Amino acid sequence: MAPGFTYEFLPMKTEPKFQPYIGLEDHFQISAATFLNQLGALWFHTPNGGLRDKNIARKFKAMGLKPGVPDILIWDQRQGFSGYAIELKCGRNTPTDEQAFWLNKLQSLGWKTLITWSLDEFIFEVESYYGIKTIAQSLKV
């Protein structure tokens, strides 16, 4: 991460009635999504997180939802990698065993992987992946 260079969470376009349901990691995810959309990346978010009703959880599992799949999967191939798998974390959260399994498996299949607790690092690393030279990268020591 570049010293002295900080990104704020990007503005969200959500209705006020949904604001109470948006936590810190949700803000991180929405900011990352906003950035990736502005970048024009081919990507998606796997909706694995969050609390769900038991019936909905059973339905999703039956439909093939897998625990531990990284938060963000970027399908654009760059720098010899098949794609970029990114796990977003907040606070003192650490990767689960399932998340570590997926990241290691994707890495063995030629994917670049990242676990990050910072929007700054996320943006910096994604820009690096795409070969984008920015002010933040020129400040890296």
Language-model features: locations:
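Catalytic phosphate/metal-binding cores of nucleic-acid and nucleotide-processing enzymes, i.e., regions
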Residues: M1-V141
